């Protein structure tokens, strides 16, 4: 089980990314717009750098919904491999079962 502080930190980052998403997109469009003046592009670059670091989606880490484990994460289920196996064995994940051939 991951520390509560790590799980909360990740939740805080998710909120921050959602909060600044539109602003980041607009600034990035301005920066990549070659028809805009160099001065405008430079201002947009400085504005983007002034945003909080945690507003960047690159800093997000996928974590298990139950344990908060960051490794062995299955995107399709939102669970780590350990919890996924446990849930499948209990029959909690529809359409998934243990392989047998």
Curated annotation (Swiss-Prot):
<protein>
    <recommendedName>
        <fullName>Small ribosomal subunit protein uS14</fullName>
    </recommendedName>
</protein>
<comment type="subunit">
    <text>Part of the 30S ribosomal subunit. Contacts proteins S3 and S10.</text>
</comment>
<dbReference type="GO" id="GO:0003735">
    <property type="term" value="F:structural constituent of ribosome"/>
</dbReference>
<dbReference type="GO" id="GO:0019843">
    <property type="term" value="F:rRNA binding"/>
</dbReference>
<dbReference type="GO" id="GO:0015935">
    <property type="term" value="C:small ribosomal subunit"/>
</dbReference>
<keyword id="KW-0699">rRNA-binding</keyword>
<dbReference type="GO" id="GO:0006412">
    <property type="term" value="P:translation"/>
</dbReference>
<dbReference type="InterPro" id="IPR018271">
    <property type="entry name" value="Ribosomal_uS14_CS"/>
</dbReference>
<dbReference type="InterPro" id="IPR023036">
    <property type="entry name" value="Ribosomal_uS14_bac/plastid"/>
</dbReference>
<comment type="similarity">
    <text>Belongs to the universal ribosomal protein uS14 family.</text>
</comment>
<keyword id="KW-0694">RNA-binding</keyword>
<keyword id="KW-0687">Ribonucleoprotein</keyword>
<comment type="function">
    <text>Binds 16S rRNA, required for the assembly of 30S particles and may also be responsible for determining the conformation of the 16S rRNA at the A site.</text>
</comment>
<keyword id="KW-0689">Ribosomal protein</keyword>
<dbReference type="GO" id="GO:0005737">
    <property type="term" value="C:cytoplasm"/>
</dbReference>
<dbReference type="Pfam" id="PF00253">
    <property type="entry name" value="Ribosomal_S14"/>
</dbReference>
<dbReference type="InterPro" id="IPR001209">
    <property type="entry name" value="Ribosomal_uS14"/>
</dbReference>
């Amino acid at each position: 089980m991951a520390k509560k502080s790590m799980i909360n930190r990740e939740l805080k980052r998710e909120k921050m990314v959602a909060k600044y998403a539109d602003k980041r997109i607009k600034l990035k469009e301005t920066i990549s717009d070659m028809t805009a003046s160099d001065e405008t592009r430079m201002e947009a670059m400085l504005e983007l750098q002034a945003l909080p670091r945690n507003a960047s989606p690159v800093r997000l880490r996928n974590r298990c919904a139950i344990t908060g484990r960051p490794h062995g994460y299955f995107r399709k289920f939102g669970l780590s491999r350990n919890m996924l196996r446990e849930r499948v064995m209990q029959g909690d994940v529809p359409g998934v079962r243990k392989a047998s051939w």
